[in-house]
Amino acid sequence: MPFYVERLALEAGATQQSIVLHVTLLTGVYALMQLVFAPLWGRWSDRIGRRPLILIGLGGYVIAQVLFGLSTSLWLLYVARIVGGILSSATLPVSGAYVVDMTTKEERSRGMAWLGTAASLGVVVGPALGGLLSRQDWHLNWNAAHFKIDSFSLPFFAAALLGLLTLFAAWRWLPESLPNTLAQDAHLAKDRSEKTKSDWRTLLKTLFPLLALTLAGQFALTMFEGTFALFAQAKFDFGPVEVGYVFVVCGLVMTVFQAGAVGFLAGKISEMIQIGVGFALMGTGIALLATAQTKPLVFVFVALLSLGMAFIAPNLSALVSKRGGERQAGASLGIQNAANSLGQSVGPLLGGVLFIWQTNAPYLLSGAVLIALALGIAWKVVVKRRAAISTL
């Protein structure tokens, strides 16, 4: 996306600084839509079921990718991101709620790890495919009104095609995980309408510490994601293919360790300890990225921060679903997705501003925040264990 935005912005006469802001704004506006709509989709899935909202989310993703690929101006890119953010924000929280429906509490972390593994596989395939398809020697150039197809469009059309195939597979083979949902909703509609506000407040109060950690993790991750292409281009002269390779490494590390280590450790080491280790690894990797002087070190440090995120994401989702309760799994994970989205909105915007000020600043700040959180979690775990020992 950064290189696509850069091309359209340069055609519109934008400066290099405004290009940075457009890249981060386009990242942030998508997250802002998810911030607003993900909790609503999650709550709605508790009422009418998971399947229809997963289908809506996948359909919205397809529409957004097609619009993005056809865009010839920055304003069309913003329209595509807003539409995609609104509709596809149903996918993640409702998929998480689906996992909650299909697993026991003991299996929850493992289930969330496998869900994260599926998402990480997308991170592996997406950048590699995008880098290949955006090559300049495809000689594509078609224009009609406000729409255009060229080499930069192909990755988005490929994503739309994959999304369409997934939508068909879900429509054809995905069963509903909430039995008798519509009947339950009709019977409880009056009670729910009266209790909705208090339910939201109770959930927010119960989940607040976990939501704060979720926000911090996504803030740091998207500050990295939103500025990395610009950082790597400025410091190491990376192009789309090289940036794609870096994100392939990121996705591979998350895929392997979420499927392997996190699933294996589920039930053996508490979720909070794994989260603390994840913050320490991620913070160290991001901070060291600012000091990298060679291209191989970039890959090493990105792998380290990806390893940290592999521990953070599934364990946070598992804790949120447990503390929120199974009957409100959609609402709980929807609120968590809103916290994710808030971090995704603020991270790229602040990252863009810091990058304009000083190239390494986004990574030094986010690394310091994550390491401080890791130390705070470690202190809390130690205090809790001492209290437990003293009561024996």
PLM regions: where:
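Short amphipathic helix-loop junctions that connect adjacent transmembrane helices
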Residues: 1-20, 226-242
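Conserved MFS/SLC helix-loop-helix module at the cytosolic interface between two early adjacent transmembrane helices
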Residues: 35-72
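Helix-to-loop junctions at the C-terminal end of transmembrane segments
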Residues: 36-49, 257-271, 355
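Helix-breaking motifs and short loop linkers at transmembrane-helix boundaries and internal kinks
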Residues: 49, 70-75, 87, 237, ...
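Intracellular juxtamembrane helix-capping segments at the cytosolic ends
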Residues: 90-104, 311-324
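C-terminal membrane-cytosol helix-exit motif in multi-pass small-molecule transporters
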Residues: 160-183, 376-381
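Juxtamembrane intracellular "pre-TM" segments in multi-pass secondary transporters
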Residues: 175-216
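C-terminal transmembrane helical hairpin of 12-TM major facilitator-type secondary transporters
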Residues: 257, 270-316
